[in-house]
C-alpha cells in the first residue's frame, strides 16, 4: 500500500472515531424509582407515591413531569463515594438552562448530600408557591444575585442511610431564575463560614423537586464541572 493510500485510510479511521464518539445517547423515559448512569451523568428518580415521568436526554439534560405526588425528585449529576470533601474534589460548578412550570410547591435547584456529618443541601434558583425558609443564617452574593441562607433539622426522616435525623442547608436566591451558572463550591464555603459543616461528598446534582403538587420542567442544559 502506498503512502497516499495509508494517509487516506488514516483520515477515514479518524473520521469514523469522531462520528462514533459524537453520537448522542438514546433518550430514555422512566416512571418509577430508579438510579443509574446515562450519557456520563448519574441520575435518579425518587418518589414516595404519585405519577411521575423522567426522560433522560443527552449529557446532563432531562425533562420531568409529576402529578398527585407526595414528594418526588428528578436529578442528574454526580454521585461520589463519600471519601472526599469538596475541598479535595476541587471547585464544583453547574451551568444550566431550563423551563420550569411548577403547579404548586416545587424547586429548581442544585441538590445533594454529605456524610460525616450527614447533611442534605439545596441551592434553590426558582420555586413554585412556596419559597423555602428556616433558621436564618445570613446572606451572600454569588452568580449575579443574592442568596439567603437557612438551616433546618429533619427528625427521623428518610435519608441516604435510611431513617435518620440530619441537618438541611439552604441557599435560596432572592429573585427567581431558570438559567445561569451556580458556583456550587462558593455556597459550600459560605455555609462552612457560618458554622454549617460539610462532610464527605456523596452527591451533587441539578434537580427538580415537587412536593404535594403537579408540574413539569425541561432541563435543556446541565453541565457539571468538577475540579476546575
UniProtKB/Swiss-Prot annotation:
GO MF, any single term: endo-1,4-beta-xylanase activity
Catalyzed reaction equations: Endohydrolysis of (1->4)-beta-D-xylosidic linkages in xylans
Keyword Isomerase: no
Signal sequence bounds: 1-27
Domain of life: Bacteria
Keyword terms of this UniProt record: Carbohydrate metabolism, Glycosidase, Hydrolase, Polysaccharide degradation, Signal, Xylan degradation
Xref: Pfam families: Glyco_hydro_11
Pathway, per record: Glycan degradation; xylan degradation
Active site: 120, 209
All residue ranges annotated as the GH11 domain in the record: 29-222
GO biological process: xylan catabolic process
Family annotation (InterPro entries): ConA-like_dom_sf (IPR013320), GH11/12 (IPR013319), GH11_AS_1 (IPR018208), GH11_AS_2 (IPR033119), GH11_dom (IPR033123), Glyco_hydro_11 (IPR001137)
Enzyme nomenclature, EC number: 3.2.1.8
Family: Belongs to the glycosyl hydrolase 11 (cellulase G) family.
Protein name: Endo-1,4-beta-xylanase A
Species assigned in the record: Bacillus pumilus
Amino acid at each position: 500500500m502506498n503512502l497516499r493510500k495509508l494517509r487516506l485510510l488514516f483520515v477515514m479511521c479518524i473520521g469514523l472515531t469522531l462520528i462514533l464518539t459524537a453520537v448522542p445517547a438514546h433518550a430514555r423515559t422512566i416512571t418509577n424509582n430508579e438510579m443509574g448512569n446515562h450519557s456520563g451523568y448519574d441520575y435518579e428518580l425518587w418518589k414516595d407515591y404519585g405519577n411521575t415521568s423522567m426522560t433522560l436526554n443527552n449529557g446532563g439534560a432531562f425533562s420531568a413531569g409529576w402529578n398527585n405526588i407526595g414528594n418526588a425528585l428528578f436529578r442528574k449529576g454526580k454521585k461520589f463515594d463519600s471519601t472526599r470533601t469538596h475541598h479535595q474534589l476541587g471547585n464544583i460548578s453547574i451551568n444550566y438552562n431550563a423551563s420550569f412550570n411548577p403547579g404548586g410547591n416545587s424547586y429548581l435547584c442544585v441538590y445533594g448530600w454529605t456524610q460525616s456529618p450527614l447533611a442534605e443541601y439545596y441551592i434553590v434558583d426558582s420555586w413554585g408557591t412556596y419559597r423555602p425558609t428556616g433558621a436564618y443564617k445570613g446572606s451572600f452574593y454569588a452568580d449575579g444575585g443574592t442568596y439567603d441562607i437557612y438551616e433546618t433539622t429533619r427528625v427521623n426522616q428518610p435519608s441516604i442511610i435510611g431513617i435518620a435525623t440530619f441537618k438541611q442547608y439552604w441557599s435560596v436566591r432572592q429573585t427567581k431564575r431558570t438559567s445561569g451558572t451556580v458556583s456550587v463550591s462558593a455556597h459550600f464555603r459560605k455555609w462552612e463560614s457560618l458554622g454549617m459543616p460539610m462532610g464527605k461528598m456523596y452527591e451533587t446534582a441539578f434537580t427538580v423537586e415537587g412536593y404535594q403538587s403537579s408540574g413539569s420542567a425541561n432541563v435543556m442544559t446541565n453541565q457539571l464541572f468538577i475540579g476546575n
